[in-house]
Amino acid sequence: LIYDQQPIGVKSINNKDTDHEISSQYIFNAGHRENGQRNYIAEGLANADADDIILISDVDEIPNLDNINFQNINEKIILFKQNMFYYKFNLHLPKLIWTGTKSCKKRDLLNPQWLRNVKDRKYPFFRLDTFFSKNKYQSIKYINDGGWHFTNLKTAKEIHFKLKSYLHHREFDVNPLTVDQINEIINDKRAIYNLNVD
């Protein structure tokens, strides 16, 4: 599959726009592009059966499928709790569990971005808002030891380039880091941003 179209919702940025409007539009446009690419996955699922299990991951999220019998899972949504690795394969952030890979049966899949947006907590039965929400669910199965999330396995220069071009690049445009500052962060074994915010 090749995704070579401009996604719906991308808007032009004009010279007359305020700084706030420009920042907002950069972020919204990046989100529309990322969501459009992710939703295009559905084109490759056209021939999948209704009971097929669909897993949606970013490219740096690897689900651990050992010891999982999907036939024994009755919940609607499956969330994989993944170990987080930063900068190097052996630099584990033990205090952060990443819920990256998410899964459901094809019959329940609204679209890939919907699955990605599902909140990573199980809501109690008395939360009536879950009956009307498209991202809050009660029927969730957590897979502990659910895999690995390897992020920013790059040099400081490569991370600098990534930060200028990915979804949240506007934050970086407004508060940039130099390659030397990123190198210092790597050497201190710190995350670039507060990963608990998202």
Regions found by a protein language model. Name each.
Residues 175-198:
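Charged phosphate-binding loop/patch that engages nucleotide di/tri-phosphates or the phosphate backbone
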Residues 30-34, 61-177:
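Conserved catalytic core of nucleotide-sugar-dependent glycosyltransferases
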Residues 1-56, 65:
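Active-site-proximal specificity loops/subdomain of glycosyltransferases
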